[in-house]
Amino acid sequence: MSKRIYSRIAGTGSYLPEKVLTNDDMSKIVDTSDEWIFSRTGIRERHIAADDQATSDLAYFASLKAMEAAGVTADEIDLIVIGTTTPDLIFPSTACLLQARLGNVGCGAMDVNAACSGFVYALSVADKFVRSGDAKTVLVVGAETLTRILDWTDRTTCVLFGDGAGAVILKADEETGILSTHLRADGSKKELLWDPVGVSVGFGEGKNGGGALLMKGNDVFKYAVKALNSVVDETLAANGYDAHDLDWLIPHQANLRIIEATAKRLDLPMEQVVVTVDRHGNTSSASVPLALDEAVRSGRVQRGQLLLLEAFGGGFAWGSALLRY
């Protein structure tokens, strides 16, 4: 009987643009304040990509760090999967652009669009390739320049988001790694969180073809908490664990209140929850790998620990991954 093959995270990396926009800076752009933003979201500041930076640039720098941490060269990568909702171009994919810049020739490369859940979705896709034996080394990235699709006159949305990228290298392993991933969606709720322009339905006037992120925050909050509770319970039960077995919860960094609600539901102390939303804002698909990389590099996350990753985003699309780091 053949052994089970796991996909193990062999290295992590992240990149944040140099420009930082604080809440006080935001108060000069729209009618808001540090107290208003922080009390509702837990956000203090966010990073903004430079005018000459695209999503693939952020992904590239995060990937280099993950590759270095894993001791992997570009020609060893069998597959590149990027979770993003802000690709450089309509096509080719941002993953193809990243492949070329890394100097890899011939490996598969694809983008996955699941909004803020993009990295968890990309991780799930990559995990299946490794477990099936079709790939031994996979680069998985979550990267966004979400500030490019914001309405900077709408104080309810423009204060929430930032730019960044996080990456992991997955390697085939017979001992440990990703235990399971669980993906869910509900397209009937699209108008609660969306950008209503596109190639097929058409574009409007102005920057980005009139595209701008629209969100009904209270409705999103209520749905997200219930959906995340459900998928987290499903993930733990599928592997014979309960919340008290977890070493770390690494959630999507959208809103501190959602993070705290999930932790409370799991009866997890916040000391076991990785929180970066205060310094990064909501970086969409980049938020989970950014938080993971920070926790690894700070020494909090150690080899052998049990980690639960979860995310929720537009679509709605949400998901989770349970892994032994």
From Swiss-Prot:
Q: What class of enzyme is it?
A: transferase
- Residues in the signal sequence: none
* Involved pathway(s): Lipid metabolism; fatty acid biosynthesis
Catalyzed reactions per annotation: malonyl-[ACP] + acetyl-CoA + H(+) = 3-oxobutanoyl-[ACP] + CO2 + CoA
The answer to whether keyword Cytoplasm applies is yes
| Molecular function per GO | 3-oxoacyl-[acyl-carrier-protein] synthase activity; beta-ketoacyl-acyl-carrier-protein synthase III activity
A GO BP entry:
fatty acid biosynthetic process
Q: Give the residues annotated as active site.
A: 116, 252, 282
Alphabetized UniProt keyword annotations: Acyltransferase, Cytoplasm, Fatty acid biosynthesis, Fatty acid metabolism, Lipid biosynthesis, Lipid metabolism, Multifunctional enzyme, Transferase
Q: Does the keyword Ligase apply?
A: no
Compartment(s) where it occurs, according to its Swiss-Prot or TrEMBL record: Cytoplasm
E.C. no: 2.3.1.180
Sorted alphabetically, the Gene Ontology cellular component annotations on this record are: cytoplasm
Major subcellular location class: cytoplasm
InterPro entries in the record, alphabetically?
A: ACP_syn_III_C (IPR013747), ACP_syn_III_N (IPR013751), FabH (IPR004655), Thiolase-like (IPR016039)
Share what the entry says about its subunit structure, partners included. Homodimer.
The function of this protein is:
Catalyzes the condensation reaction of fatty acid synthesis by the addition to an acyl acceptor of two carbons from malonyl-ACP. Catalyzes the first condensation reaction which initiates fatty acid synthesis and may therefore play a role in governing the total rate of fatty acid production. Possesses both acetoacetyl-ACP synthase and acetyl transacylase activities. Its substrate specificity determines the biosynthesis of branched-chain and/or straight-chain of fatty acids.
**Domain annotation text?**
The last Arg residue of the ACP-binding site is essential for the weak association between ACP/AcpP and FabH.
Family (UniProt): Belongs to the thiolase-like superfamily. FabH family.
Q: What is this protein called?
A: Beta-ketoacyl-[acyl-carrier-protein] synthase III
Give the originating organism: Xanthomonas oryzae pv. oryzae (strain MAFF 311018)
**Gene behind this protein:** fabH
